[in-house]
Amino acid sequence: LCERIPSFDLVRFTNSGTEATLNTIRAARAVTGKSKIAKVEGGYHGSHDQVSVSVRTNPAKSGERTRPDAMPATEGLGEGTLDQVVVIPFNETTIAKRRLEENKDDLAAVIIEPMLGSVGMLPATSEFLSMLREFTADNGIILIFDEVISYRASSGGCQEYYGITPDMSSL
């Protein structure tokens, strides 16, 4: 795996994608000392509280297109969970960068599926992923690719396909 996947220097096996994303986020928080994460609207990263936000959204309730609200994916999320998640619109490079800029001092990580599995395998644009890579690198924020589903896109996953290496990956 370390030879095939650009972002892998070390591997930790888990029993599920949920555990994999939980551990990458936990590691990002430990490394940066920050607590917030950013995720794209419509992205599915498992069923733990940190990512059970804005998975399936109702446009009438999810805020403005340029400032999506963090919406619970299910009842029972821990108190304060929604305050720890910055939701950015998928493939809206300028809008997403603005949202990230507003929160950069508090963000531990940006987690993204390079190809949104829960909406029918919708690929991110190279421009969008490049902006995320550049922004996170410039601001000391960990970029996490959740490739639990999208890894199948090529022998080295979407990160090989796009030529963009995240700081951490889940697959």
Regions found by a protein language model. Give the residues of each.
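Conserved PLP phosphate-binding loop immediately N-terminal to the Schiff-base lysine helix
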Residues: 113-126, 140-163
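A short helix-to-beta-strand connector/capping loop
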Residues: 81-84, 139, 164
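Active-site core of PLP-dependent enzymes with the aminotransferase class I/II
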Residues: 92-99, 115-139
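Hydrophobic beta-strand scaffold residues
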Residues: 107, 136, 143-144
